[in-house]
Amino acid sequence: MLPFYESQLEEAVIALLEESGWDYTPAADLPRGDMRQVLLHDDLQAFLQRRYADLSLTPSETAKITAQLAHIPATPLYAGSKQVFRLLTEGLTLQRDNAALPAAHLRLLDFDCPENNTFRAVNQFRVLGSRERIPDVLLFVNGIPVVIFELKSAIDEQVSV
């Protein structure tokens, strides 16, 4: 039997994702200052500026949105996941820096025109928390993590999750 390497499966999954339209970026190539943070700030801010160009969002306003997502607690898992799901499906209301402007309802994903979203696959994305985690492949939409792949060998009985 030929040896099986998880890295080969990881490469195959990434190739399939690229064929499906996902942009691939190795984690080492991402600008990240804080390894505890899982958002891709540049992708999120670029989406907001592009999608809501008519609102002329200020850097302070996009920072508020990013902070709202970044400060959702990871534990308890169900509560945090529910809060993120609500933001992704319902959007959020942004109070504008200029009080003369009305509040704006923003959606973090463009369901009407999916091609307006940024789909990014990242491998070996290191995250520091109570312990270090390095998922094999992480999928982001507009800089927001939405899917984790942890690829394991089906033939190695010693593998751990």
List the predicted regions and their residue ranges.
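An alpha-helical interface "stripe"
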Residues: 1-161
